[in-house]
Amino acid sequence: MSKINDINDLVNATFQVKKFFRDTKKKFNLNYEEIYILNHILRSESNEISSKEIAKCSEFKPYYLTKALQKLKDLKLLSKKRSLQDERTVIVYVTDTQKANIQKLISELEEYIKN
């Protein structure tokens, strides 16, 4: 990624980002929060991560995080369970099949960016 040196660079970068997410919403029906979560899970060393950890690194408001996780669960891209240590904690996890599906999706998005 090139460095943003002035307002013109920032405006151009913002335009490209907005276009990417608009096109992604049309093609995959995924928004920024959902793509962020999928990418975060894919880059994670573990197949399990707490929703609190996702919230901490993303700074998403609880409502948006809950809504995004539920949608991704409904799309069968991830699964959720309650922590055995603390029932209030939601654990997000992916099976090998789900992780492969996420990898395929992220690869398609990255290919779109390159073109």
Swiss-Prot record:
Effect of residue 105 to G: Abolishes DNA binding to the agr promoter
Recorded family membership: Belongs to the SarA family.
Keywords per UniProt: Activator, Cytoplasm, DNA-binding, Repressor, Transcription, Transcription regulation, Virulence
Function: Negative regulator of sarA transcription at late exponential and stationary growth phases. It contributes to the modulation of target genes downstream of the sarA regulatory cascade. Also, positively regulates expression of primary transcripts RNAII and RNAIII generated by agr (virulence accessory gene regulator) locus.
Principal subcellular localization: cytoplasm
Keyword Cytoplasm: yes
Effect of residue 111 to A: No effect on DNA binding to the agr promoter
Effect of residue 108 to A: No effect on DNA binding to the agr promoter
Top-level taxon in the UniProt lineage: Bacteria
Subcellular location: Cytoplasm
Outcome (variant: residue 88 to A): Abolishes DNA binding to the agr promoter
Organism encoding this protein: Staphylococcus aureus (strain NCTC 8325 / PS 47)
GO biological process, any: response to stress
One Pfam family here: Staph_reg_Sar_Rot
SUPFAM superfamilies the UniProt entry points to: Winged helix' DNA-binding domain
Phenotypic consequence of residue 52 to A: Abolishes DNA binding to the agr promoter
Outcome of swapping residue 9 to A: No effect on DNA binding to the agr promoter
Organism taxonomic ancestry: Bacteria, Bacillati, Bacillota, Bacilli, Bacillales
Effect of residue 61 to A: No effect on DNA binding to the agr promoter
Keyword Transcription found: yes
Protein name: HTH-type transcriptional regulator SarR
Outcome after substituting residue 38 to A: No effect on DNA binding to the agr promoter
Description of what induces expression: Maximally expressed at post-exponential growth phase. Level of transcription reduced during exponential growth phase in hemB (delta-aminolevulinic acid dehydratase) mutant.
DNA-binding region (UniProt annotation): 51-74
InterPro entries referenced in this protein's UniProt entry, alphabetically: MarR/SlyA-like, SarA/Rot_dom, Transc_reg_Sar_Rot_HTH, WH-like_DNA-bd_sf, WH_DNA-bd_sf
Cellular component per GO, a single term: cytoplasm
